[in-house]
Amino acid sequence: MKQVNSQETKQRILNAAVGEFVEYGYDGAHMQRIAEKSGSNKSIIYYYFKSKENLYEEVLSSIFEKAFDNVEMALNKKMSLKKTLTYLIENYINFLEQNPSLLRIMMWENASGGKHIKKLMKKHGSDSAFNVAEKLLRLLEDTIKRGELRHVDATQTIISVVGMCAFYFITKPSNQIVWNIDPEAEAEFIKQRKKAIVDLILHGLLPETEKAKNKDH
């Protein structure tokens, strides 16, 4: 029972920390507010996480783990390249839609120069959650070598796909205003967004022979 309570306390602290870092970023976050929101105190937080930096890095680690879980699953499935790319794009958009707070934290982190991400990559570079990007890169490079994709820069392609998926959510308020997107109809818009990105990426990556096959089906 004590172990269960310890895990519950730790999770409450992490949940409160997410809200704090979303609103204030790392530099503006206060441990006292996290303690109050989690129904604990600063001594308990320091007992579990040792420091504000360790707590923040634990939050970042959870973001990477959640973001890469679906990627790992897709890479482990025996699917065609087209189905793999479609699965990755659709599930990444689902992740962004369901976790807006995590995207906000990443924006704060990027604004600070990504110093904590750099530290985490050095610390956990060989762990699965931080190794998925390398696996995805190798997948694209291998398929390019086999002629299943056009000869493109794999790194640039991954960054482009991530940007296309994330841009709407990063700039959602202005996008809804500029493009007159009804918040009540957003689910349908996001559904169409998935289709548009998949279509654009597949037609940009597939060799001409594969494009012709897709048109015929």
Regions found by a protein language model. Name each.
Residues N91-N94, F130, E134-R150, M164-H217:
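C-terminal peripheral helix-coil segments that are non-catalytic and often amphipathic
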Residues M73-R104, V132-A133, A154-V161, K191, ...:
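Hydrophobic alpha-helical connector segments
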Residues V59-L88, L139-D142:
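Amphipathic alpha-helical linker/stalk segments
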Residues I13, A17-F21, Y92, I201:
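Short hydrophobic clusters on alpha-helical segments that form packing/core surfaces
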Residues N54, I93-K135, E141, Q156, ...:
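Short secondary-structure transition hinges
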